[in-house]
UniProtKB/Swiss-Prot annotation:
Source species of the chain: Cupriavidus pinatubonensis (strain JMP 134 / LMG 1197) (Cupriavidus necator (strain JMP 134))
Record SUPFAM superfamilies: Elongation factor Ts (EF-Ts), dimerisation domain (SSF54713), UBA-like (SSF46934)
MF term (GO), any: translation elongation factor activity
Organismal lineage: Bacteria, Pseudomonadati, Pseudomonadota, Betaproteobacteria, Burkholderiales
Organism domain of life: Bacteria
Cellular component GO terms, alphabetical: cytoplasm
Protein name from the UniProt record: Elongation factor Ts
Record keywords: Cytoplasm, Elongation factor, Protein biosynthesis
InterPro entries assigned to the protein according to its UniProt record, in alphabetical order: EF-Ts_dimer_sf, Transl_elong_EFTs/EF1B, Transl_elong_EFTs/EF1B_dimer, Transl_elong_Ts_CS, UBA-like_sf
Region (Involved in Mg(2+) ion dislocation from EF-Tu): 80-83
């Protein structure tokens, strides 16, 4: 059997970015043949990605990129908060954000097929899964390229906001921070999605019915609740987070600034996290051992 040297392991690691021990195992299995070892590693890393694909990814990061009037916000997910701080994962996220800005893919599938550092985004993602050992996914992104000014705000790496505006940049940055804190769903009350209004109206109707009030009063209660909700979730109507004596709309008017649109991403929003039941896990392991 050929001797496996440190330089051989280092060379294979440089080619595949795989963990050191995995490289040594592959070289041993390939009897020192570097090309064969590389092929073995590619297959192994791919198998790891396949096994990881079904695992829930509710942690992760939001990354942003702005170049002039082009801006991107992208959410990438992983399984644990620990990996969300991994340098390789963060570097991949930043590169993906920049690639979206430059190449303008239509969706995540198109993005995955684009080339990044000489290989496809999908191949890079798969290799990273093999290296880190967790499922990693690109969940969603938005790209602004309408010619307007842009600012972004990241609260750590878990909340990201992109704001398109005309006017004062400092005021726009304040709005981005406000959006991260108050989480509006639209610019104005008129733009609140119909399904959200219907859901709120249904809740209000149920409460009104339970109150036992006469129909006319109950109807007014429902309408009042809906109008209050619309003000609470529309950006322009919200009390400004840095000065609640004025609304965001009033603050923008005083700053001679117009907000044309915004996007808010919160990591894992809407993804059901897996709740581990330790007792059930132990019971399952005991049962499996007894069968064996």
């Amino acid at each position: 059997m050929a001797a496996i040297t440190a330089s051989m392991v280092a060379e294979l690691r440089a080619k595949t970015d795989a963990p050191m021990m995995e490289c040594k195992k592959a070289l041993t299995e390939a009897d020192g043949d570097l090309n064969k070892a590389e092929e073995l590693l590619r297959v192994k890393l791919g198998n790891k990605a396949s096994k990881a694909a079904s695992r829930v990814t509710a942690e992760g990061v939001v990354a942003s990129f702005i170049d002039g009037t082009t801006g991107v916000l992208v959410e990438l997910n992983c399984e644990t908060d620990f990996v969300s701080k991994n340098d390789d994962f963060l570097a991949f996220s930043a590169k993906v954000a920049e690639l979206i800005a430059k190449q303008n893919p239509a969706d995540v599938a198109a993005l995955s097929a684009l080339e990044l550092d000489g290989v496809s985004v999908e191949a890079t993602r798969t290799a990273l899964i093999g290296k880190i050992g967790e499922n990693l996914t690109i969940r969603r992104f938005v790209r602004y390229a309408n010619g307007g000014k842009l600012v972004s705000y990241l609260h750590g790496t878990r909340i990201g906001v992109m704001v398109e505006f005309d006017g004062d940049e400092a005021a726009a940055k304040d709005v981005a921070m406000h959006v991260a804190a108050m989480k509006p769903v639209s610019l104005s009350a008129e733009q609140v999605p119909a399904d959200l209004i219907a859901k709120e109206r249904s809740i209000a109707e149920q409460k009104a019915a339970e109150s036992g009030k006469p129909a006319e009063i109950a109807a007014k209660m429902v309408e009042g609740s809906v109008q209050k909700y619309l003000k609470e979730v529309s950006l322009f109507n919200q009390p400004f987070v840095k000065n609640d004596k004025q609304t965001v709309e009033q603050m923008l008017k005083a700053a001679n600034t117009t907000v044309k649109g915004f996007t808010l991403y919160v990591v894992g929003e809407g993804i059901e996290k897996k709740q581990d039941d330790f007792a059930a896990e132990v019971a399952a392991q005991v049962a499996a051992a007894q069968k064996g």
